[in-house]
Amino acid sequence: MKPTVAIVGRPNVGKSTLFNRILNKRVAIVDDVPGVTRDRNFSEAEWCGKQFSLIDTGGYSRTGDTFSAAVLEQSLIALQEANIIILVVDLRTGITDIDLEITELLRKQASEKTVFLAVNKVDNNLMESDAQLFRKLGLSEPYFVSALDGRGVAELLDAVIAHIPEDDAPESDDTVKLTVIGRPNVGKSSFVNAILGQNRQIVTDIPGTTRDAVDSRFKRNGQDFLLIDTAGLRRKAKVDDNIELFSALRTEKAIERCDVAIILLDATQGLENQDLKVINAAAQKKRGMVIAVNKWDLIEKDDKTAIAYEKRLREELRNLSYVPLLFISALTKQRIYKAIDIAYQVWQNRRMKIDTSRLNNLMLNDIKRTPPSSKSGKEIKIKYLTQLATEPPLFGLFAGNPQLIEEHYKRFLERKLREHFGFEGTPIELKFRRK
């Protein structure tokens, strides 16, 4: 298991900037507004060959509002999960009452953990004399850094990895990568929390309360999963500041990273245009998909309600008939684990490799019974098939005049492939080559 390093501190001291500097990429949302990192942001990091998980927490604050209380809870969970803690303070503001509170919190909650003090915004050697003030906090020897330009960060990381033992057993790459997507307030974070069994994300009834995408690992039936929750896709007209824009881009990146997208819909509102955009985003990236209709507990129903609801959805999503659909409630946990099990099956389907002889025995019989035709009258003869790739499954079909094969016949071939081999939840690609 990789050790976990948590970055903590009050709002706007530069925690997310340090997080991004360590990763050498922009992962956490960084803005001048205090409290922008409202949730814990996870990522895998490496320094000098040693790997660790890095957590960027929301800023510790005591303003008394709902979000500050929730962020405090998240920070406490991060302290429990972490093996090593980096406390970030701000040279420009000096030691504040909140810095003292956090220091006391660390003494009580993390007395057995390794704590590093990073004095941020120390932009040159002359400023280091002022930074000596932070020794009064009574923590470890302070490290003077500038997260913005990288000054001193290497020395800090050298000290951090000195406390990380050599990794004897590297993690398996055979991990199912899932992402939970949907428009705002369909219950994505509630779903993640229900699966993980802890309040890993800030959840309120306000749309958009999950700003950053968050990675979480869990096991089910011996299988490793990586679960990525996202900020939700928004209509472009509503992305009216740089924070929301970057969150929307993060959602698209999360789709790129995943194997299977669990797409949440709101049972109380039906299918909306924004839902279609979310679904199309996953389909265009050729990802596996599972549609989970959430808040099913709020629907008045009889024994025919689910059948009628699914029929209506299927009519609106005709091109995605291969995508499994189920009804869930993140609040009551109804069928949430079934959603994970179906996603696992979709993951397996994406990796399925069909033997060439079996493929041709079944498919060439179908092609013989229903041969392709062209408007030009030229003969189109498909001679054989082979699977070229997986994730998603890609099939090569070798034929004479392949450019004349029409779209309706391509759909026929895809339908037959699914009838014979399944491939539920995953797109199939066909590539025609001249023979």
From Swiss-Prot:
Residues where GTP 1 binds: 9-16, 56-60, 120-123
InterPro entries according to UniProt: AAA+_ATPase, G_ENGA, GTP-bd, GTPase_Der, KH_dom-like, KH_dom-like_a/b, P-loop_NTPase, Small_GTP-bd
Record keywords: GTP-binding, Nucleotide-binding, Repeat, Ribosome biogenesis
Start and end residues of each KH-like domain: 352-435
Claim: Nucleotide-binding is one of the keywords in the record: yes
Residue intervals of the EngA-type G domain: 3-168, 176-351
Gene3D superfamilies the UniProt entry points to: 3.30.300.20, P-loop containing nucleotide triphosphate hydrolases
Stored CDD domains: EngA1 (cd01894), EngA2 (cd01895)
MF terms in GO: ATP hydrolysis activity; GTP binding; ribosome binding
Any GO BP: ribosome biogenesis
Annotated positions binding GTP 2: 182-189, 229-233, 294-297
HAMAP family to which the protein is assigned, alphabetical: GTPase_Der (MF_00195)
PANTHER family per UniProt: GTPASE DER
Complexes and interactors: Associates with the 50S ribosomal subunit.
General function of this protein: GTPase that plays an essential role in the late steps of ribosome biogenesis.
Recorded family membership: Belongs to the TRAFAC class TrmE-Era-EngA-EngB-Septin-like GTPase superfamily. EngA (Der) GTPase family.
Protein name: GTPase Der
Lineage: Bacteria, Pseudomonadati, Chlorobiota, Chlorobiia, Chlorobiales
